[in-house]
Amino acid sequence: MIHVGLLSKEKCCGCTACYSICTRGAISMKRDEQGFSYPEIDENLCTQCGLCVRTCPSLSPKFYKSIKCFGAKHINKQEQLSSTSGGFAAALSDYVISKGGVVYGVALDDVKYVRTVRINSRADLPKLKGSKYVQTDPCETFRQAGADLKYGLFVAYFGTSCNIDGLRHYLLCKNISTSNLVTIDLICHGVPSPQIFEDYIDYLSKRKPVNNFYFRTKAKGWGFGSKTFSPSVCYSDGENVCDKPITLAYQQLFFSNNCLRPHCYECPYAQMGRAADFTIADFWGISIFHPQYFDKDGVSLVLINSNNALNIFNNLQNIDSFETTTEIAYFKQENQRRPSQKNSAYEQFWKDYHQKGIEYILQPVSYTHLRAHETGRNLV
């Protein structure tokens, strides 16, 4: 293969490692008709050096075995409550900043754009809080993280497994030391289309301007899977709409498995081998195996996949934790064993989206083509 432009869409995870490594500027990331970004090669600039192929994680994914597993929660109740799970990510991020380091994580930009950003102060860490069920745009962060590491900074990078593996491949190809790097991936269901989410926020904004959208809140507490996700939209006039059909609609799209990136249905990272130093998730099943540690305000599952991660974990002062087993950790984590499966209505879903728009595809409960009036549900 002479360049990554020849990869099928099912093989491309959109991590931007190829774009970041190309010194000729021959690669740009362009959205397709589903709203996912893929590398586009300028043949006039490409020298067929092969760097983009060498840095592509999909062609040679790397995995690490978990060496320890923990349940954890932040000792500060407000930090725990404002986090999606137990607040471990917040505790780790604060630790890195306290050491003079920088944190790369996913934030909402102007409500509807999901991007990976660089944070170097405690005051800005709240931007990274909360799940974002959309594929992020890494922007220039691989290059920025590489520059920070070369400068000697302590760097933490949060992302999906494919994103993290792409970063590691990029740094390896650039011969940049990763001794000051700690990576954190997620047990990932799959990444939905950014275009779908942007259209969804535009749809919500027809009612009145949207100030913020929360993919998950703890309005119903935590611990019982998606039934307690309680997504919420905050409008500019202060109105907060939570757990209503209009806010649940995007969550239902996400779990329908119709709007995930094609690569997600064949994801090589949906397995017990991990791509990062830490893997974090909700500790689903804690009430079954560790009822004494259950907390309705959230508990994080933390997989330790390297000695680097174990050393950092042992130095964290702002968490309460308990050790568990891999069997318990994986019990309620289906995507730790297999990728999400493509919905049988997938082709019809995209046809309807392109022909009829976002409002039409938001109506079904699980995309069985039942309209809202047929299910007895109304969006507003």
Which residues does each PLM region occupy?
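Flanking helices and flexible, charged tails adjoining ferredoxin-like Fe-S electron-transfer domains
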Residues: 1-2, 44-151, 327-361
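A short alpha->loop->secondary-structure connector
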Residues: 173-185
